Each structure stands twice: as structure tokens, then as C-alpha cells.
């Protein structure tokens, strides 16, 4: 309210010196098995890759790396006080840490023979070299996860993924030659400008990765080579260049999912995808802002509880709630927004300027990529001058 003393725009706070914080402020070990049943050590915060669909990549800027010695010490201290048999080096893009390979090498050496596994949530395709492949495989093995996100180079340029076909094939070869047998690939469906050709391209990328695995390891079920692809439905997220986008209609999402399944012919490629109805509700909640309060309350009255759990989600309840408050769920999700309109979340700011997001939206439409400012020049997102901070890189990043 005017005169209340509250700022018209609330800007995020930022930890400028990430290395001054304790990676393990409090580690609680549960009495039961949980989904993420492992020690987690955050090795860096922020990401400047600039994927245009990614909210975290925009809102957690700038990039701040922890020193290598601090990461190793925290991991070993955490394992000693918790008894976990796995430690995950977490961040938005762990392999982007300038000392990632050295950290893995040190942990693998120190933990040799202990039965402890060192894991990384996801690997960047263009920073997963031979050395990285060997170090990730140095401890107890699981599967490797990469995120090409789109099935064609054209669409990867639109979303600013900045990985090439060569990057994908080289990362796959490095992984298989280092002894890995299972690779998981993450994609998104319904991205702005996506066509059927891009959808079919998802299956083609998976097949190429599988073929490389068979070339390196051999064919047949005994080789153990397999590829799984997980396909999320694009949800427009606030404070991203794609916040003005429409979500693909529910029926069209289902049609494209079926097209992908029909395009995947190899039994060693497993396909899973997100529920179209869940993704529709996510888009509605993302785009409505404060106006979504009445919808959420109506959904609660209709019995919605723990809807992030698959066995609890009931789309009909959300449809009933929408009718009660006069909201068409698909109408909200599939409606594009104007670059000039005031958005429901404009009273909050991650310190990335709206002007930068608009420029990125226009560059996406033109298929023009934007470089990572930790490896090239400043892209003018506005975070550093607004918060009086800067990227803090411990070593040298070269993107490979």
C-alpha cells in the first residue's frame, strides 16, 4: 500500500561470499529411508549458461564457486558424522565448477575402498570430457545423466542450450569408453517454436547415443548398454525469457508424446514422460500470480491434497475448482502474454532486468544464442551492478 513503507519492488538477497558459509550448517540423518538418502554438498551457487526456460538459472545468479579444498573437507566431514554411503556434489551445473575434476579425483582417492559413492546430479554435455568421465566413474557406479533438452540443433539454439551434436556424441563416447553402460537423457516437449521434426529428433538423439554405446561396448543384452529418455512438458516460468510464452495445449501434448513413442523403435531405449494434466496445472499456477489464490482454495475444498504425489493427483478436482471460480485452466496456460503488459510477478525481482529477459526472448525468436558470461564477456543481465556482486570463479572455465 502507498505510505506503508514497503518497497514497490522486492529484490532478492544474495550471499556475495559463498565460500564464507559452512557447506554443512546442520546435517540431520532421518530414521527411515528417504528419496534423497545421501549427503549433499553444494559446490557452487548460480548458473550463467542462460537456458531461456530455466527459472533457477536466472534467479540464482551470479555464479559463486566454493574453493576445492572446502568442498572436499565438507564432503569427508559430512560422511564421517552421518554414516552415509553416498555423497552428491550438488548445484545447478556441478560439472561447470572450474575444479570439478580435481574435486572428484581427490574424493575418489580419499574414499577408495570405503564403499562410498560420489555422484553428480547431472552432467553438462559440453563439459564432460575424458578426464571427467574417468573421475565420475572412479567410485561405485550408477547411471549417467545428460540433458540435451531438445531434439534438434535449431531448437537448442532457440532455448540457448549451447550444446552441439558433436558435444552430445563426444560426451556419450567418453562415458561408454570410461565403462558406463546406462545413460539417461532429459528433454522437454512443447518448447517455443517446437515442431514434429524436433519431437522425432528426440528419438534420433537417443538412438545415436545408443549406437555409440554399442560401437564401444558391443551389441546384445549382455553388454548392458541402454538409454532412457525422460521428457518433461514445458511450463512457462516467471522471471525467464520464456515467461511470455504459451503452454502447448493438453491434447497437442498428448499427440506429440504419442509421436515420440511411435518414433522410438529400439527395445534398449526406454521412454518416460510427464503427465500432461499435471503440467497443465503447473502452468496455471505459474502464470496466475495472486489471482490463483481463489483457484487454490477451491481446489483444496474439492479435496486436493499432496498433489505432487502421482497417486494423490486428481485432475478432475482441478477442473471442478476452475469451474467454481470461473477459470479455464487450459485458457490460462495456453494464453501468451504481451511483452508490454504488467505481469503478476513484476513486484518481485531476482535482479535480472526485465529488459534483458525481453532481449533474450527476441534472440530466441531469431534463433540467436547468448554466451556464458563466466567464459566470455558480460551479457548485461543486470545482476552484478544491482546487487553489487560478481561471478566468483576459483579456477579457469573453458566449457570443455
Language model regions located:
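N-terminal [4Fe-4S]-dependent radical SAM core
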Residues: 1-40, 351-363, 393-398
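Terminal amphipathic helices with adjacent charged low-complexity linkers/tails
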Residues: 1-13, 66-67, 74, 94, ...
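N-terminal pre-triad scaffold of radical SAM enzymes
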Residues: 27-53, 79, 120-121, 142, ...
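Canonical Radical SAM [4Fe-4S] cluster-binding loop centered on the CxxxCxxC motif
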Residues: 33-69, 379-396
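Conserved, mostly hydrophobic/aromatic
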Residues: 47, 51, 71, 120, ...
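Flexible glycine/acidic-rich beta-alpha junction loops that bind and position SAM and/or redox cofactors
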Residues: 49, 97-99, 128-132, 154-159, ...
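Cysteine-cluster motifs in flexible loop/terminal segments that predominantly coordinate metals
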Residues: 54, 337-400
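Conserved SAM/AdoMet-binding glycine-rich loop
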Residues: 77-228, 232
Amino acid at each position: 500500500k502507498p505510505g506503508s513503507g514497503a518497497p514497490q519492488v522486492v529484490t532478492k538477497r544474495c550471499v556475495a561470499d559463498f565460500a564464507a558459509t559452512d557447506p554443512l550448517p546442520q546435517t540431520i540423518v532421518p530414521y527411515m529411508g528417504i528419496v534423497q538418502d545421501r549427503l549433499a554438498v553444494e559446490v557452487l551457487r548460480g548458473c550463467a549458461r542462460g537456458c531461456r526456460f530455466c527459472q533457477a538459472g536466472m534467479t540464482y545468479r551470479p555464479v559463486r564457486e566454493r574453493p576445492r579444498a572446502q568442498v572436499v573437507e565438507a564432503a569427508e566431514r559430512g560422511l564421517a558424522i552421518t554414516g552415509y554411503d553416498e555423497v552428491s556434489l550438488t548445484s545447478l551445473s556441478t560439472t561447470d565448477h572450474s575444479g570439478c575434476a580435481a574435486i572428484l579425483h581427490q574424493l575418489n582417492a580419499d574414499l577408495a575402498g570405503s564403499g562410498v559413492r560420489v555422484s553428480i546430479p547431472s552432467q553438462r554435455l559440453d563439459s564432460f570430457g575424458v578426464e571427467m568421465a574417468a573421475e565420475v566413474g572412479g567410485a561405485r557406479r550408477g547411471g549417467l545423466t545428460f540433458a540435451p533438452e531438445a531434439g534438434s540443433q535449431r531448437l537448442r539454439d532457440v532455448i540457448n542450450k549451447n550444446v552441439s551434436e558433436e558435444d552430445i556424441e563426444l560426451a556419450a563416447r567418453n562415458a561408454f569408453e570410461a565403462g558406463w553402460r546406462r545413460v539417461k537423457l532429459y528433454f522437454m516437449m512443447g518448447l517455443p517454436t517446437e515442431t514434429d521434426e524436433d519431437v522425432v529428433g528426440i528419438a534420433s538423439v537417443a538412438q545415436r547415443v545408443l549406437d555409440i554405446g554399442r560401437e564401444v561396448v558391443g551389441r546384445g543384452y549382455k553388454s548392458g548398454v541402454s538409454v532412457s529418455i525422460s521428457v518433461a512438458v514445458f511450463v512457462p516460468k516467471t522471471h525467464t525469457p520464456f515467461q511470455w510464452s504459451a503452454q502447448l495445449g493438453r491434447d497437442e501434448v498428448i499427440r506429440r508424446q504419442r509421436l515420440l513413442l511411435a518414433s522410438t523403435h529400439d527395445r534398449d531405449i526406454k521412454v518416460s514422460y510427464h503427465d500432461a494434466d499435471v503440467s497443465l496445472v503447473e502452468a496455471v499456477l505459474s502464470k496466475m500470480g495472486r489471482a490463483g489464490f481463489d483457484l487454490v482454495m477451491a481446489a483444496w475444498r474439492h479435496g486436493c491434497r499432496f498433489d505432487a504425489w502421482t497417486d494423490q493427483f486428481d485432475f478432475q478436482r482441478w477442473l471442478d475448482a476452475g469451474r467454481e471460480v470461473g477459470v479455464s485452466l487450459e485458457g490460462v496456460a495456453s494464453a501468451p502474454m504481451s511483452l508490454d503488459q504488467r505481469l503478476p510477478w513484476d513486484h518481485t525481482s531476482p535482479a535480472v532486468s526485465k529488459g534483458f529477459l525481453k532481449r533474450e526472448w527476441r534472440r530466441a525468436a531469431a534463433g540467436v544464442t547468448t554466451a556464458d558470461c563466466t567464459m566470455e564477456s558480460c551479457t548485461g543481465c543486470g545482476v552484478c551492478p544491482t546487487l553489487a556482486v560478481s561471478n566468483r570463479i576459483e579456477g579457469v572455465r573453458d566449457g570443455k
